[in-house]
Amino acid sequence: MDSSNPPIHKDLRFSGEDWYGREFGAERFENCVFIDCDMTEITTVGTVFDHCEFRGVALNASVHDTSRFDNCVFSDSSLFGATLRHCKMTGSQFRATAMRPLTIEGGVWSWVNLFGADLRNINFDHLNLEESDFGEANLDKATFRGAVLQNATLRGASIEGAVFTGADLSGVQLAGLNWRKARIDGQIAMLIAESLGAIVDN
């Protein structure tokens, strides 16, 4: 395959495909729909999925390196045991999709909709999560060390035991969250106090 001219798949519908263990390179899928496909243990390297839908797709134990899932929708799917390394997930939505255990190593997850997701124990350290929606998600014991959460939504999320040390929480509505057992640093403690109406003297 000529890597300088990767294949482009547009406006296609894939239903019931058995792609177990398939390897995807620098190819591009645009406005494609994947329905009830088995993509268990697939690997993607530099693959682009743009405005694609994954409905009832098994992505268990799949590995993705420097791939992009831009503005994709995952519904009733499974990422059990998947690994995403330096992937771009901007604007993607996850609905009734199994997300754990999940390994994330770097990447951009801004504007991602994870509303109501079970994200316990997942490591989001040093990720760009700007404007992402974690509303009503279970974030117990998840870690966000050094993550960028500017203007993210955490309303109604459970954060018991979560770690936010070094995270950027500017623009986040912090009042109303139960911070019991969550790990924070001095800067975040000040933001929480100010969100509750306290006047913090420097």
Task: Annotate each language-model stretch with its function.
Residues 1-202:
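Tandem repeat scaffolds
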